[in-house]
């Protein structure tokens, strides 16, 4: 049984999963909308929402924390200066997942994840 299991492993090792989420987060921040599988989108949602909440503080330490997760100067700058200030009045719920299609090669359910 899968009851009370903590998180999605996405059939990857922990380092591979961490790299995948980092790259998906950078792509979402830079493009504000990406298409991926539903499982990856749901995992990315919790990852990116925690990052945006940290970025909303707006101070130097928050900037360092966000950069430690993303390791990308442009994505960090865009998140801190453009995206986070938009959500000052909003308490969570910064992303939207829209199911789109099944992928032809392996019939994986696909979805768009976008910043609200």
UniProtKB/Swiss-Prot annotation:
GO process terms (BP): translation
Domain of life: Bacteria
UniProt xrefs under Pfam families: Ribosomal_L17 (PF01196)
Ribonucleoprotein among keywords: yes
GO MF entries: structural constituent of ribosome
GO (cellular component) term, any one: cytosolic large ribosomal subunit
Similarity comment: family membership: Belongs to the bacterial ribosomal protein bL17 family.
Subunit structure: Part of the 50S ribosomal subunit. Contacts protein L32.
HAMAP family associated with the record: Ribosomal_bL17
Name of the protein: Large ribosomal subunit protein bL17
Gene label: rplQ
